[in-house]
Amino acid sequence: MAALNFEPLFPLIRDNQSFVITSHVNPDGDALGSEIGFAEWLRSIGKKVRVINHSPTPYNYEFLEKPNPVVEQFDAAIHPDVIYAADVVFVLDVNDAERVRSLGRYLSRGAAVPKGEPIPDPTTKPIIVIDHHLNPKEFAKEYFIDTDATSTGELIVRLIRQAQPTLGGTISQQAAQALYVAIMTDTGSFKFPRTDSGTFRMCADLLDLGADPVRTYDEVFNTSPPGRLLLLRECLNSLEYHFDSRMAFQVIMQSQLATAGAAEEDVDGFVQMPFQVRGIVLSVFLLELKEGWKLSTRSKGDVSAAAFAQTFGGNGHFNAAGARVHVKHDFTEMKRQILANAAQVLADADLRAQAAKDAVIAAP
């Protein structure tokens, strides 16, 4: 684990009293775990903290808010004043104000505002981004980004450990549980490439502080509503292999969500399933939204999921990325674009692999 230096943040935390923490739309375990863990530590050093998200907390992460409720869903009648009044705003696990959705317009003039609604003035207070994704957008005062980190949760643990000798504070049982969830989920239960011995040492420390790995797994993965498995059946029925079975493609439509009695959040993890098949190096999952489409992509080795997502205006990590397409193309056109862009991403990976082989052969 590289040593990102958080010391420049210490005076900002020490000298201010009120903080807002937020993250991306449809928050995952890393976003929520990082927010809750960080908020709990800030409160332990006497700070006032509000955690405000655009989206509600998904059902399988609600246990993180016990015993103390933490996360508020954005309310336009209340929260703009909270944001303006805060001394500092922390944006975790995302580096684009657009992806903060409702709160984004209060952080950057570049964030979209729904048609017909007034454009508010962004806060003049410091905005701090802590994240591990590629290609940050300019809107914050300072960025603390480590794209080699397993998760934003890992970065929050490092921040707290660096700050404790100066600022004090404790990692409570609730904070430890939340930060463990952040790391566990964003490493794919410790199977993604950046997982190393330091990851396990950090998680061992969190277990010593009260994180419960058995309960965590059960709450995160074994609390699905009945509709999720019905939706999974539809997803697997849509499965197609392309490019000599190197790429897998799956899709779920709005009509299938309705029939299954499922929600959009119930598709979480579907994109990962094709990697159970030998030879798959790129998986693309397409979800029809009420207005547009959502793409999730995962890859293995030298195949860039990020490059694929960027062809649709998205972003992410090299091997895990996503995008939203706000234009409602019909399915046939979306699939055509997906396959064309996937072909290019696979071809680029093949060229990189061949260049690496040629370099080895040419080496003295």
Where are these regions (language model features)?
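Short glycine/serine/threonine-rich phosphate/pyrophosphate-binding segments
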Residues: 29-35, 97-101
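Active-site cofactor/cluster-binding pocket
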Residues: 71-141
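Short alpha-helices
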Residues: 125, 130-203
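Glycine-rich, phosphate-binding/catalytic loops in enzymes
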Residues: 37-39, 106-109, 145-146, 201
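Short acidic, glycine/serine/threonine-rich loops at helix termini
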Residues: 33, 62-65, 102-103, 139-142, ...
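Hydrophobic helix-and-loop "lid/oligomerization" segment in the mid-to-C-terminal part
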Residues: 2-25, 33-65, 69, 73, ...
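Short glycine-rich anion-binding loops that position phosphate/pyrophosphate groups of nucleotides
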Residues: 25-27, 94-97, 133-135, 254-255, ...
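Hydrophobic/aromatic beta-strand patches that form the interior of the parallel beta-sheet core
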Residues: 52, 90, 126-130, 142-145, ...
